[in-house]
Amino acid sequence: NYINGYDKDSNTIYELKTTIDKSGYPMDIDISNDGQKLVTSYMKIQGTKVQSVIAMYNFSSVGQNENADRMMGSYTVDDALYPIVKFTDNDNIACFGNNDIRTYTMTEKPEERAVIDLRSREMQGVFYNSSCVGYIAVSDSASKAKYKIYIYDNKGALKAEVDYDNAFDKIYATEEEIIVTGDMDCSIIRFNGSMKFNYSFTKNLVNVVPDSNEEEYVVIFENETQTIALKGM
């Protein structure tokens, strides 16, 4: 496998070669917004055991001075898979796995910030921004709601738990809020867990995204779009 990076003029910035024997099978990859850093997730099979290797690279002058392949650090986790790794901003990383969520800070070299135990819950969707991470999971038998949304800061502290009983298909976070859609339902949730907006439209939703104007949102249906404004929110 090769990982190639290019500038806006299609010139090669870097080329990394990985092998299944050494690195494992690629699961996910992400690059920081400034294009200077890279995170990768690989799955390795060691006999009958599975390992995940999360590796971080820095292609700025810092990484150039460190070593030839620009790797600044890596973390090996036994009995785990991390199919989603994301830069939440230029200096922070969230890795979503089958057993936990791991967050890292990487101003220059990576440092682990938090390990958030999923407590055997299966994530149905994940979200993140520069200050928080979270996920939605099927509620346990003690809850009347279909789903529960868990919101953490990037140091791993639980900020809120939200019961969610609408249809669910997509969840994501902006810097201001969490947006959840499914079928004809849409909810906008604040990071403290309070509900900002909850509505069922008359047509199936494709997506809901914030507009450039504050408190306005573009609602995307299969055959049209509408702009809605929230008042008194």
Listing of model-derived features with the role each one plays in the protein:
Residues N1, T12-I20, N65-T76, P110-D117, ...:
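A short beta-strand motif characteristic of beta-propeller blades
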Residues G35-L38, N92-A94, C132-G134, I178, ...:
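Hydrophobic beta-strand positions that form the internal "hydrophobic ladder"
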Residues I116-N207:
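Intrinsically disordered, low-complexity segments enriched in Gly and acidic/Ser/Thr residues
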Residues Y2-G5, Q46-Y57, N99-T105, A142-Y150, ...:
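Structural motif
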Residues N1, K22-I31, S74-T88, L118-S131, ...:
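Repeated scaffold domains used in trafficking and secretory/extracellular systems
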Residues D7-N11, F59-V62, M106-K109, Y152-K155, ...:
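Short loop/turn segments that connect beta-strands within beta-propeller blades
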